[in-house]
């Protein structure tokens, strides 16, 4: 695919006090982020959850970390275990954690953890 902005440097686009878009911020980390997605989805594949009303969600999703968002006939929950495997969600990949921290610092939140 042709990237018309391949030569553009990352930049920040302030939206409002305390909110900014970090354009192209994650591009240099793309390979590590995709590896992290592969690691998560190997253990907890993408799936279409069903709402309490019985409708299948159009978005396929998975989770990682201590809690994951899930839905079932009883409602919406944050769950420690994957409802399909009853195993804990995969740990959040280090590349995700590093990106979150570095983006928060770049956006003006130096104490983010």
Provide a role label for each language-model segment.
Residues 1-113:
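Non-heme Fe(II) oxygenase metal-center motifs and adjacent flexible, charged/small-residue loops
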